[in-house]
């Protein structure tokens, strides 16, 4: 039922979502993933199988959920102006919640770093911790991430200006820059001399940078989806809500990373 046909039967512009199994399925999959990560930190036998199963379940259910949303937006015409305003507002509230989460992590870091107690040796980083050097992989990652912010802006201007080629090329370059960032971050983690179990420093460091790492993985998936939709002419110069939220998400993660780099890598060392 198109938007024109639906308007003959209802007197409001809002989309009444049909019953869907995906919210509850994704919720249980995310809960299983969080549980498996907790089991991993405590060294339970067979925890990796649960992690792989949870990641597979989250990926599959999220993909099917995205498929339904794309169908509602592109083929059924359910995303009216009022619905798009609601989506934008919901995403802004999501961004605010993410900022508050990272604010709590920065608070935890400063709480221990500015007044290290005797158990930490009275110094920061604590005695025995060899911190990651800010001029190595973290600096490269910072350059990559700032470059991705420039390329996604280039792509956005191309889409709004009707230049499809620039929009596609900028989006593709941004996607690969994010993939390179995630790869470099993984290499940094595997070569670090401390883990998340190494006291308050390891816990806060991996909680902050690791949470940002997970968000970058999500961003890569969002960029891939938007690239596919743009290639298939789902997005126009005036109707591209998912694309705009992805651009905003990319810039927010850039800003958060700058604070992480300055505080966790540079000031903290």
From Swiss-Prot:
A Gene Ontology term for the protein's cellular component: mitochondrial inner membrane
Gene3D superfamilies the record matches: 1.10.287.70, Cytochrome c oxidase, subunit III, four-helix bundle
One Pfam family in the UniProt entry: COX3
GO biological process terms held by the UniProt record: mitochondrial electron transport, cytochrome c to oxygen
Function according to Swiss-Prot or TrEMBL: Component of the cytochrome c oxidase, the last enzyme in the mitochondrial electron transport chain which drives oxidative phosphorylation. The respiratory chain contains 3 multisubunit complexes succinate dehydrogenase (complex II, CII), ubiquinol-cytochrome c oxidoreductase (cytochrome b-c1 complex, complex III, CIII) and cytochrome c oxidase (complex IV, CIV), that cooperate to transfer electrons derived from NADH and succinate to molecular oxygen, creating an electrochemical gradient over the inner membrane that drives transmembrane transport and the ATP synthase.
Assembly information from the UniProt record: Component of the cytochrome c oxidase (complex IV, CIV), a multisubunit enzyme composed of a catalytic core of 3 subunits and several supernumerary subunits. The complex exists as a monomer or a dimer and forms supercomplexes (SCs) in the inner mitochondrial membrane with ubiquinol-cytochrome c oxidoreductase (cytochrome b-c1 complex, complex III, CIII).
Database matches in InterPro entries: Cyt_c/ubiquinol_Oxase_su3, Cyt_c_oxase_su3_dom, Cyt_c_oxidase-like_su3, Cyt_c_oxidase_su3-like_sf, Cyt_c_oxidase_su3_a-hlx
UniProt KW rRNA-binding keyword: no
Protein name: Cytochrome c oxidase subunit 3
EC code: 7.1.1.9
GO MF term set: cytochrome-c oxidase activity
Subcellular location: Mitochondrion inner membrane
CDD domains associated with the record: Cyt_c_Oxidase_III
Keywords: Membrane, Mitochondrion, Mitochondrion inner membrane, Translocase, Transmembrane, Transmembrane helix
Top-level taxon: Eukaryota
Family to which this protein belongs: Belongs to the cytochrome c oxidase subunit 3 family.
Transmembrane stretches, start-end: 21-41, 45-65, 90-110, 138-160, 167-187, 205-225, 247-267
Membrane topology type: Multi-pass membrane protein
EC class name: translocase
Source organism of the structure: Kluyveromyces lactis (strain ATCC 8585 / CBS 2359 / DSM 70799 / NBRC 1267 / NRRL Y-1140 / WM37) (Yeast)
Catalytic activity of the protein: 4 Fe(II)-[cytochrome c] + O2 + 8 H(+)(in) = 4 Fe(III)-[cytochrome c] + 2 H2O + 4 H(+)(out)
């Amino acid at each position: 039922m198109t938007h024109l046909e639906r308007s003959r039967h209802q007197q409001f512009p809002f989309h009444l979502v049909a019953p869907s199994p995906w919210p509850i399925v994704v919720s249980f999959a995310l809960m299983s993933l969080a549980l498996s990560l907790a089991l991993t930190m405590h060294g339970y036998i067979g925890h990796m199988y649960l992690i792989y199963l949870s990641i597979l379940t989250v990926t599959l259910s999220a993909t099917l959920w995205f498929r339904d949303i794309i169908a509602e937006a592109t083929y059924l015409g359910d995303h009216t102006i009022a619905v798009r305003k609601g989506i934008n507002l919901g995403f802004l509230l999501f961004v605010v919640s993410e900022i508050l989460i990272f604010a709590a992590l920065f608070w935890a870091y400063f709480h221990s770093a500015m007044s290290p107690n005797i158990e930490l040796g009275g110094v920061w980083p604590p005695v025995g911790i060899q911190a990651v050097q800010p001029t190595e992989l973290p600096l490269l990652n910072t350059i990559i991430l700032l470059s991705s912010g420039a390329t996604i802006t280039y792509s956005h201007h191309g889409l709004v200006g009707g230049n499809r080629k620039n929009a596609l090329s900028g989006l593709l370059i941004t996607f690969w820059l994010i993939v390179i960032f995630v790869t470099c971050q993984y290499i940094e983690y595997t070569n670090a001399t401390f883990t998340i179990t190494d006291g308050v420093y390891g816990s806060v460091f991996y909680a902050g940078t690791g949470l940002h790492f997970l968000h970058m993985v999500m961003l890569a998936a969002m960029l891939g989806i938007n690239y596919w939709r743009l290639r298939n002419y789902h997005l126009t110069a005036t109707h591209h809500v998912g694309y705009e939220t992805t651009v905003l998400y990319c810039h927010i993660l850039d800003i958060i990373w700058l604070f992480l780099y300055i505080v966790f890598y540079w000031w903290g060392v």
